[in-house]
Curated annotation (Swiss-Prot):
This is RNA pyrophosphohydrolase. A motif (Nudix box) lies at residues 38-59. Its cofactor is a divalent metal cation. Its EC number is 3.6.1.-. It comes from Xylella fastidiosa (strain Temecula1 / ATCC 700964). Belongs to the Nudix hydrolase family. RppH subfamily. It comes from the Bacteria. It is an enzyme of class 3 (hydrolase). GO terms for molecular function: pyrophosphatase activity. Keywords: Hydrolase. The lineage of its organism: Bacteria, Pseudomonadati, Pseudomonadota, Gammaproteobacteria, Lysobacterales. PANTHER family: ADP-RIBOSE PYROPHOSPHATASE, DIHYDRONEOPTERIN TRIPHOSPHATE DIPHOSPHATASE.
Amino acid sequence: MIDPDGYRPNVGIVLIRRDGQVFWGRRVRRDGWQFPQGGMHSDETPVEAMYRELNEETGLLPEHVQLVGATPGWLRYRLPSQAVRCNRSQMCIGQKQVWFLLQLIGDESHVQLDQSENPEFDHWRWVSFWYPIEHVVMFKRSVYARALCQLASLAQQVVGLEVGTMPQYVQDICLLNVGYKHLPNWVSRY
């Protein structure tokens, strides 16, 4: 399913513990790490897609998490030119995502990465809230910064304290629509 602008509807998941650490998964047979995410089926709402992807990629069920909130709208990112795909007559140039913040309320032993026929992750760990922005594949960094910026106040409610200091470049990215003078080099490339 690709929208008329060439973006594939998708959901992203930030799974947070009470101590402010977030789930970080290593992609199978790759060295890349990322949050759980996945495409929506044409008959799904974003919430339905989120719970399906959560189970497929982490093994967690709705009773293991609490839905804290979501980004207010779609966040888009473009794929690098070598990753642009054609699906029948449609070209997919990127993804548009609704990002969800979930609090883990079950035991982390419920995390099982082998719940689907084609697991997404082969390893996982907990990392600090802002860590993923600098460690995800380059073309997703801006969307990760925007998602975490929009979810940070909700995350602070879960944690009950600061989720760490928002790096200056993240603040810059969060205000990207206004126009900037001093963005990190990688932002201008995507």
